[in-house]
């Protein structure tokens, strides 16, 4: 199936080959775990089990930053698992969320009653908290602070809906913006980045909001089936009486109009994303931050004006994901990627769309940030004849490609709420 999808995109097929035959290690080097303690090895095992996509880029981080971000992720994954567990009553869940940050200093605390798929991070929380306490104090301080704020924020939204767009921003701040702020404080604490990265919380928050809003938009149908609602009522109530009505065929035109309005809202974070990424100096941190952002940008472009959001799953091609991972390793390339997908959206804006003018305006604003009007070198350097020849040779060994690393599948399919 991936071979068929790549026929119209020969550069993606070529990049699939390069990725499998060594290109992956240039972007995501393999981590040596031989020198790790048994408890830290267990933490990395949980990291790979709960999110292979984030595990790949986390394990590619330099120095002690790698362990700090690994533990940060697992702590927040445990907190998120508590929040998501619908079998726990709100009366019991609220104090758990409020006090969760304190459990990091209780060596024996664990929670064994969760029914969620990632419950192992709660059941074996003593292993995670042990490695947390082994971190330098400068990292512990950041993780505890973010964990406390996130726990209180999650508790606030347990029994209330996202009403306004302002509330949407607030919810996304609690569950994702705080992650961006926390990471941005960890980076300079490691001395791998300048203090400004951690001081500019507005742009760090935008990094998280952009990813979270993209996931919420894409996952409309899945969330509806699970009884969850994250689209802001202020927006969708202009089109239908109930959010679930968008899934009805007779409402598809209204559904797409609302979709386009939310995507336009989300595009407003891209200028902050560009500014944030342009300040990064460490290569491993740049890759860690840039890859999820360009994946989200490609996903938004795939969702824009697309009825499929309300009918099934919208995801980018595996070859497209691999190409983005291999290209997004420097700022000029990231700018070119953003330019490409902004143009895709711009040329698909319906004249009849109520939000068309606003969409055009934000894309024009993004264009002013020195986005190059050109293709990426890796996508235009090779001639069509050369690419076709490569495809012919590659087709003979397609079975080999079927074992392509699961990391690319996760980047395409995994939405982390």
UniProtKB/Swiss-Prot annotation:
Entries under Pfam families matching the protein: SQS_PSY
Cross-referenced SUPFAM superfamilies: Terpenoid synthases
Bilayer topology annotation: Multi-pass membrane protein
Family annotation (InterPro entries): Isoprenoid_synthase_dom_sf, Squ/phyt_synthse, Squal_synth-like, Squalene/phytoene_synthase_CS, Trans_IPPS_euk-type, Trans_IPPS_HH
Residues bound to Mg(2+): 80, 83-84
Protein family (similarity comment): Belongs to the phytoene/squalene synthase family.
Its job: Catalyzes the condensation of 2 farnesyl pyrophosphate (FPP) moieties to form squalene. Proceeds in two distinct steps. In the first half-reaction, two molecules of FPP react to form the stable presqualene diphosphate intermediate (PSQPP), with concomitant release of a proton and a molecule of inorganic diphosphate. In the second half-reaction, PSQPP undergoes heterolysis, isomerization, and reduction with NADPH or NADH to form squalene. It is the first committed enzyme of the sterol biosynthesis pathway.
Name the UniProt record assigns to this protein: Squalene synthase
Organism listed in the record: Bos taurus (Bovine)
Taxonomic lineage: Eukaryota, Metazoa, Chordata, Craniata, Vertebrata
